[in-house]
Structure formats: structure tokens, C-alpha cells
Design a protein with these regions (language model features):
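Structural signal for the N-terminal portions of transmembrane helices
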Residues: 1-38
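Short, structured interface segments
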Residues: 26-45, 176-192
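Membrane-proximal cytosolic interface modules of multi-pass membrane proteins
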Residues: 39-57
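Structured cytosolic domains appended to multi-pass membrane proteins
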Residues: 53-274, 280-289, 308, 316-317
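Terminal export/targeting leaders at protein ends
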Residues: 214, 299-301
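An acidic/histidine-cluster motif and surrounding catalytic segment
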Residues: 293
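Substrate-engagement module of ASCE P-loop NTPases
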Residues: 301-308
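C-terminal functional extensions of proteins
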Residues: 316-319, 323-353
Length: 353
């Protein structure tokens, strides 16, 4: 590349090379964004009528990873409200233990915790299948158990122990919902469920085109029915119309309200209406799926800023698409996701230095 066109001047110098690299990087990012957008358009075009929940074969098997005794009962209680009582299927309790020097002691703690939640569920005439699992990677352990038990969804507590990790998603939650394309419900319950007075649900646009639309809607409708509390859905008019039709036909006794919310920028205003005895539910989406939007990247910041201390469910529904590659034992518990803007900005800063 060091071809001199004159003394001290080269045909291709470092500035030209840097420019070429920047153009290649830019075109790669733009092409991936266009491909993703085109895939969403094709999906919407081919799915004029949403696929309804399979009425002939419900695959419901709820997996509940538990770790903290003070929180396990509320997770099991919520799972009991969400389950289909007519199927009378067992709940699955899971405790994952690190493969370290404290493994044996933690195994025994896990067994005692699972025995407790089994007795708690039995008091409501619900059976539980349990397992204490040893793993070097918590997310990997949950994913493997999910497949072994042929589970349909995961109900898990949100990260609340700042002494373990200061990150909003904790050590492994983000790896979990990125690595599974099945329904994952993350819970933060600050009070007993039977004291809740209202459920408020935020639904993204195009959520009706996702594979798991009717699954999460059915779960929330059951909870509202059992608690006999009012449930209010916030979203686009076309999405609310389908929700209204489903609730009216399948759960006519549920008291449901509907409020139009055209953009996720309305979350701060909605926060003013969320009381301490409300359950705030956010239906979100994974990157690359039909209902995903860039505004959802800041979901964790929005929740910390406006919904701190509130009862909360974050739902990642069943969604089309392949999950990320299987994690290995060497993979870290938590993997960060960076936007294209962050990647380009980081590269430019390095070049300037």
C-alpha cells in the first residue's frame, strides 16, 4: 500500500484506510437494520390474521426458579393464579446451585426451600415437581431444565439484591431472555397478591402479531379473574380491539378497561396513575422481533426512574425467531447488548485517540 505518488505522499495513506473501514462498518450496520426491518414487514404481510392459542393442545408447564425463601411463596402463588386449573398439571420448582466450594451446603438449602414451596402449593391442592440443579452458569442451568421438563414458560423473580449485582437485570436475567424465545415473566411483588386493587398493562404496537400474544393475555386474564380486580390495557387501537374481543369471549366476568397509548413516551405520564396497590405489567419484546422498537432499549432506565418500588411484571412473550447460540460453561453470567450507535461511537473514539 506504500506506493508513493510524490515524495512523502502515498497513494493510500492511513486516513484513506480509516475512511474505508468506517464506510464498511457503516454499510454493515445499515444493511443489518434494513434486513431486520424487511423481515418484520414480511412477517406482518403474511400474518393478516393472528394465530390464536391452540385450543386442542395446551402445552402449559410453568417453570419457577426459586432462590430466596422470603420471595418464593409469592412466585408460587402467582403461578397458581396463572395456571389452567382444568388441566391440573404440576408446577415445576427449580433451584440452581453454583458448582463451587459451597455447593453441598447450598444444595441442602435448595432442597429445604423446594420442600417448603411444595407444601405451600399442596395447601392449594396443586402438585409440584422439583429439582435442585448444579451448574457453573445459572442461566445455562435454567435453560437446560426448561428443555428437560418440556416447560412452556418461566416465572421468575426480578433481581432486587444490589449486594449481588448493581445492574437492573442482575447477573443472568438478560442472558436468559436472550437465550430463550419462549415466554418469560419477571416479577417484583412488593405485597401479597390478594391486596392488589388494579392491574395496568402496557402493550407495544404489533404485539398481536407475536406468537405468544394469546398466552400472556390468557395468564393476565386469569389473574384478574381470580383476584376480582379491574384490569386496564394501554396500547394502540388495533391491538386493544383484539384484546377486548378475546377477554370478552373467553373471560366475560373480568372487568377490563382500555386506554389508547400511541407511543412508549407515555410511560412517565402513566407512572402518575400507578398506586402502591396496583400491579404494573409491561409486555416487551426481544430485539429483531415484530413488536420490538428502539424505545424499549431504555426500559430498565424508565422503570428505575418512574416505577421504583411498584409491583411489577415484565413479560417477554413467545416470539418467532431462533434463540442465541447455546451458552458454554465458560460464558459469563451476563452479556451486555450494545446498539449500533454505541458500537460506532466506541470505534470512532478509539480512532481519535
Amino acid at each position: 500500500m506504500k506506493i508513493e505518488v510524490s515524495e512523502g505522499r502515498y497513494l493510500v495513506d492511513s486516513e484513506i484506510l480509516n475512511g474505508i473501514v468506517l464506510v464498511i462498518l457503516f454499510t454493515c450496520v445499515i444493511s443489518s437494520m434494513i434486513t431486520e426491518r424487511s423481515a418484520q414487514i414480511i412477517t406482518l404481510r403474511d400474518k393478516d390474521i393472528p394465530v390464536e392459542e391452540d385450543k386442542n393442545g395446551d402445552d402449559e408447564r410453568i417453570l419457577i426458579p426459586v432462590k430466596y425463601p422470603e420471595y418464593a411463596d409469592r412466585l408460587v402463588n402467582l403461578a397458581i393464579l396463572m395456571r389452567n386449573a382444568k388441566l391440573n398439571r404440576e408446577l415445576i420448582g427449580l433451584n440452581v446451585v453454583y458448582d463451587d466450594d459451597h455447593m453441598r451446603a447450598n444444595q441442602e438449602k435448595g432442597r429445604r426451600l423446594l420442600e417448603h414451596v411444595t407444601q405451600y402449593a399442596a395447601a392449594a391442592d396443586v402438585k409440584m415437581q422439583t429439582q435442585v440443579r448444579i451448574a457453573a452458569n445459572i442461566a445455562n442451568g435454567i435453560k437446560h431444565a426448561f428443555k428437560e421438563f418440556s416447560a412452556s414458560e418461566i416465572l421468575i423473580g426480578m433481581h432486587m439484591h444490589k449486594d449481588v449485582s448493581a445492574k437492573f437485570w442482575g447477573e443472568f436475567h438478560q442472558s436468559l431472555f436472550n437465550g430463550l424465545n419462549r415466554q418469560i415473566i419477571m416479577c417484583r411483588l412488593m405485597q401479597p397478591l390478594n391486596t392488589l386493587r388494579r392491574i395496568q398493562v402496557v402493550v407495544p404496537s404489533r404485539a398481536q402479531f407475536e406468537q405468544g400474544f394469546y398466552r400472556w393475555l390468557e395468564r393476565l386474564s386469569r389473574v384478574a379473574g381470580y383476584l376480582e380486580c379491574r384490569i386496564q390495557f394501554h396500547g394502540r387501537a388495533d391491538t386493544l380491539a383484539l384484546i377486548s374481543e378475546y377477554v370478552r369471549n373467553r373471560h366475560p366476568d373480568v372487568r377490563a378497561d382500555y386506554a389508547e397509548m400511541t407511543h412508549w413516551n407515555g410511560l412517565p405520564r402513566l407512572a402518575e396513575t400507578i398506586a402502591d396497590d396496583h400491579l404494573f405489567v409491561v409486555v416487551t419484546a426481544r430485539k429483531g422481533t415484530v413488536s420490538y422498537k428502539s424505545a424499549q432499549e431504555g426500559l430498565s432506565d424508565e422503570i428505575k426512574r418512574h416505577f421504583s418500588g411498584k409491583n411489577l411484571l415484565i413479560i417477554f412473550p413467545d416470539q418467532f425467531g431462533d434463540a442465541m447460540d447455546e451458552m458454554t460453561f465458560a460464558q459469563p453470567q451476563h452479556t451486555e447488548e450494545n446498539s449500533a450507535y454505541d458500537v460506532i461511537s466506541t470505534w470512532i473514539r478509539k480512532q481519535v485517540k
